[in-house]
Amino acid sequence: VGLIKENKKHQELFVDICSEKDNLREELKKRTETEKQHMNTIKQLESRIEELNKEVNASRDKLVAQDVTAKNAIQQLHKEMAQRMEQANKKCEEARQEKEAMVMKYVRGEKESLDLRKEKETLEKKLRDANKELEKNTNKIKQLSQEKGRLHQLYETKEGETTRLIREIDKLKEDINSHVIEVKWAQNKLKAEMDSHKETKDKLKETTTKLTQAKEEADQIRKNCQDMIKTYQESEEIKSNELDAKLRVTKGELEKQMQEKSDQLEMHHAKIKELEDLKRTFKEGMDELRTLRTKVKCLEDERLRTEDELSKYKEIINRQKAEIQNLLDKVKIVDQLQEQLQRGKQEIENLKEEVESLNSLISDLQKDIEGSRKRESELLLFTERLTSKNAQLQSESNSLQSQFDKLSCSESQLQSQCEQMKQTNINLESRLLKEEELRKEEVQTLQAELTCRQTEVKALSTQVEELKDELVTQRRKHASSIKDLTKQLQQARRKLDQVENGSYDKEVSSMGSRSSSSGSLNARSSAEDRSPENTGSSVAVDNFPQVDKAMLIERIVRLQKAHARKNEKIEFMEDHIKQLVEEIRKKTKIIQSYILREESGTLSSEASDFNKVHLSRRGGIMASLYTSHPADNGLTLELSLEINRKLQAVLEDTLLKNITLKENLQTLGTEIERLIKHQHELEQRTKKT
């Protein structure tokens, strides 16, 4: 029983080790998968960052082009205003020169005044058009400032995305560190299990010593039984043929028991071989653990590589930040250009004031118009020149409008690209949320599995403790029954020389029933010892991982066949034991009925008759019992009644002991059936798992 327990413990330890190996493999697979997923996400993010960089570069180029075009337009406006100022100055000088000749040309001056009024109106129209163009340019500048704000927002969103990516990278680092800690914890657990395996080896040695002691005790019991059988044979040589047949049957049963014990020894040797095989498999498992450790080292190296890559990505992000700062500097330059535009506006206002002053001069000149009529023809030519210049200015304004339209188209394209970037960012955020939810669900499922396994482990531990307690109680009961049997044998030896033939026969019949009951108990216990060994071996063999699948399948099939054969043998032995018990009961009933029918003297042997004659010749109380007349004066009714009372007390004690033994046998039978059912349930569970 101790060997069975220790074998079960070894098997449970190996099963736990194998399950932990499988769990570690599954965890490594999951980690590799998660690392692959993280690498894929990192690659996707890298590609996305490259695309964003390309878009940023394109936007930069567009901004540079827009800045260049705006600068060119401003320079052209400045040139045009300078030309106009030069022309106005020239006109003023010409007007001053013409003042001297205006006196002579008063008649022509009136006509020229009318023409000048017309020219004034045209100039006012031109000023209005110029103001409108300035307003348009201011609106364009406002739109450019709005675009600048949008670009700032885009840069800020990109910076937020970079910070999120950095946080995700930090989370991945923390996950990798947690996985490394779990691997170390598993290694420590394996070391503890190795220490427990050493303790189990020491327990095996102790159990072998206990087995040798038990064998010696069994040999002594056999010798005592053989001595008893010899004494019975010497005293009952002239009994009936039925008793001889019973003795032969008992001898056959004893031989069968001897054979069963030899089979048990063979099973013990087989178990020792199986333990050696288990040691080999344990060594193989240790080699596999070493390989797993090497894999863990490789994973750590990969983790270091990933950390280096993350540092590189951080450097890239810092570079991008520097580029963003450069862009902000460029935006500041654009602000400076806006300030320059405002200055140009102020200059235009100053020019307007100068124009008003010129208008005042024109009003002064109107007084001198009378002398300016002579230059009508020249003024007409001047008007023609002004019309040509107006046409040129209109063509230039049309070109500026076309440039403005182009800039508006580029702005619309940039806005569409910004919207696409926003949509891609939203999609990425939704994907990240989905991945987080999936990982949370995986964690919850793993926690539920852990709780279920912990409950199963607790239930199995409670069952093991209950089985241990039941085995201890069975051992105690067996020890008490053996003690009772030894006491009864000693009492029978003592009473062989004192008790009469009738009482002798009754005691012999009771002893025969006891021996048969003890034989049935041994048979059942041997069957029970075999069944858990078989189940244990099957469980131990079924739980060997790390071997080729084909070898595992072949070995499982062989072990299942051997297990089925052993189960058939056990069932056959149980049926055979039941049949033997039924036959013994029938024979006991026949013997009891035969003894009740026949007289005590007919069943006695010739040796007992010679003993009776010898005692009757000697005289005394026993002689008066064996003869019809009193041979001793000391024998009285009181003495005879006391003797009868003592004999009745002995009979009552034997009957009570027989009843208790029957009850113990019944309880043992029920417990054995319960243990067999429990064993079958455990086998079914192991097969299902």
Swiss-Prot record:
Keywords: Coiled coil, Phosphoprotein. One of its GO terms (biological process) is vesicle cytoskeletal trafficking. One of its GO terms (molecular function) is small GTPase binding. Residues 493-541 are annotated as: Disordered. The modification Phosphoserine is found at S531. The keyword Phosphoprotein applies. Residues 494-508 have a biased composition (Basic and acidic residues). One of its GO terms (cellular component) is trans-Golgi network. The keyword Transferase does not apply. Residues 20-503, 550-594, 646-685 form a coiled coil. Residues 509-525 have a biased composition (Low complexity). This is Coiled-coil domain-containing protein 186. It comes from Pongo abelii. The lineage of its organism: Eukaryota, Metazoa, Chordata, Craniata, Vertebrata. The gene is CCDC186.
